[in-house]
Structure formats: structure tokens, C-alpha cells
Amino acid sequence: MFVSIYLPPRMDRIIHSSSISSSSTMAANPQTHFLFITYPMQSHINPALHLAKHFATTTGATVTFSTTIFAHRRMFSSTTNSDKGFNDGLITYLPFSDGLDGEDYKLTTMDSKEYFSLFRTNSKRNVSILLNDLATSGRPVKCIVYTLLLDWVVDIAGEHGIPSVLYWIQAATVFGTYYHFFHGFECLIKAHADDPSFPVCFPGLPPLQIRDLPSFLTDTEADGIYATILDSFRELFKILDGKQEKKMKKPKVLINTFQEWETVALASFSNEVEAIPVGHLPKEYTNSVAGYLFREDEKKYMEWLDTKEEGSVVYISFGSVSMMKKEQMEEIVKALKESKRPYLWVVRKDNREEELLEIEEGEDGMVVEWCSQVKVLAHRAVGCFVTHCGWNSTLESLVCGVPHWTDQAMNAKLVET
């Protein structure tokens, strides 16, 4: 049985680590300006936006949030002139162009190396312009916080003389796994990638098997999307190594976890990296932060949940990216029918199968295209979460106290232990 946990972010360490504030208090000078830059995926935007809003509310600093124009348009589709900046009274949102402003990009429609090369080139140029514009307008950025797949941000920050810090939006255990992979374990793991039960013992981490590792580390296709993303991770860790060598001190990394859960993992790389666990926001706060790339379903799913008994509903969602095969959909439909439990199932419009039509019409179930996951998990009627076990979903279900049936191996292992 999960309990609701909230551990407040260590804001004082973050502000001091950016070499901005000399104050010993939590409050930052209003002239302190943080720029959050994130990759245009829902799973990246959510934790970055949560932390950005927490920075703004707890430190008094100025905060700007930036992602690509395409994602920005979808976040603010109901506003006029959605390509322009937007201020919600707390944060200013300013987009940058990645060269694909008018396209609903999917990695299946373009060679991954070609896409990331285009993304890097255009984004570097336009983020640099954004930084110049902010400085010219009297709002110079004092620190940049960036998420995964954006290693090029460090170059831009350096050119402008601005300190930058990585916000690792996954688990500390996953960070430790990647760290050790790039520091002596790559050949071993690659050599045994086809042996799921092969034991892997990273320094300071609990024993693992190949099956527990992120799939990016065990995929053997040299030119696929996994290899391209792994190259981006490799660059991130090279940057951290470079910071350590140049400054003769440990680089700082913000990690989306809390000390009490991942004490062992955080200690496993503490000699090389100063990890600052920024915790997870309470459901009351997370509920109020919206930056959705998808339009919320018009079905009144919250009202539907209100009609169900406490802890009776099975909530099913596999994230905003995954696409299920017909056979997988059939298995889930069969399981739902046999469970005789009310269910709320999130299925993308372009992933619907004919089998769903029958089950969607039943009184005990509802199928939606998109919903506010935190609102659903916080509802008294939800008793179980069937999930792909992305880190955001893992933390949200933990905070809301909802048990879950999980998929991603390493996150699932963390939940079990």
C-alpha cells in the first residue's frame, strides 16, 4: 500500500549552486532569472514545468519556460497568437524554433540522425537569439536549467557566459546505470545484451540483470533511434566529465527523485556528481500545473468517476508515445471483460481498434483519448493503475497512493523494492 509523500525541493542549494545568490536565505533576488529549456515531449515538459513553477513560487525569482514552437502552440492552443510569448501570472513562456514548427513530427517519419541534427542546428541558433533578446529587453538570464536530449544547451550557455544545470527527469538509479555504463561497463553490457538473466553489478547499486536495464543500453541496432538517443546521453555524460575536469570539482545535477527513496542510488555516484534530489510535488500542486500537448477528452470522465465506488476503478494508460499492436489491444479488452471491474482507459485516437467499439459502449467502462492523469489518480474511485511505468507516472501514482501494475523494468524494480 503506497503512502502519499512530499519532500520539498532543496531550493537553497539550487540557487547557491548556480553561483547567482550570495544570500543565505531561501529567497532569491527578483532579478535572478532562470530559463527552463525542455525537449518537446509531454514526459519532458511535465517535470520541467512542475519544477519551474516551484522555483517561481518558492524563490521569488523570474522564470521563463521554453520549448519548441510546435509544442508551445499545442500547450496554448486556446490563446490568440499562440506562436508568441505567454505569461500566466507566474511564468513567461517563450518558444524557440527547431525548424519543424508546422509539423507533427514523429520519429517514424524521418531518419532519427537527420532529425536530431536538424533539431540541434536550428535550436542552438534560435535559443541563442532568444537569450540575446531577453538580455536586450533588460531580462538577462542568470541560469539555464535543461532536460534530456538537449546537450547542446551547454554550448549555448557557455557562449553567453551563463551557468547551466542538467535536470535529470528520470530516477537516480537510472542516472547511476547510465553513468556506470559510460564509465567502464559498456562493452560488458553490449556483449551480453541478448542474455536477459546475465547479472550486472554496478558499483554501489543493487544487483541487476540485463532485463532490468533501459532498452537504450541493450539495443544492438547501430543506426536506429535507440542508438541516436544513446549518443545524446553519451554527450551529456561527457559534458559532466568535462565540467569535473575543468573546475576540479563535482558537477551538479538536479534529479527528479527524493533522498528517502533512492538513498543507495544517490550515494553510488556521489564521489563523481553532486546530485540534488528535487523531490516530487504534492498532488494538490501538481494538479494545478498544466502544459498539455494533447487536447483533453470532452467526455466527462471525472463526473463518471464520481459515480463509482471508492477504490473500484482500474485506470489504464501507457503514455503519450506508445502505440499498441492489435494483438495487445485484444488481450487488454479480454482482461477488462473478465475482470468485471469498472475501468477508465486512455487510448490515442490513431491507435483505436474495432474491438474497442464494443467495450467502449459498456456501462462499466470509459475510453478516452486524453485526460488529466493526476486528477484521475487523485480520485477516490481509482484503485489500480495499469501503466507503462514511465517515471512521471511512477511518481504520480506514488504521491496519490495508487498501486500499479507496471511495464518498464527498472522503474518497476524500484517500485517493488
Language-model segments: residues:
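Glycosyltransferase specificity loop/lid
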Residues: 2-417
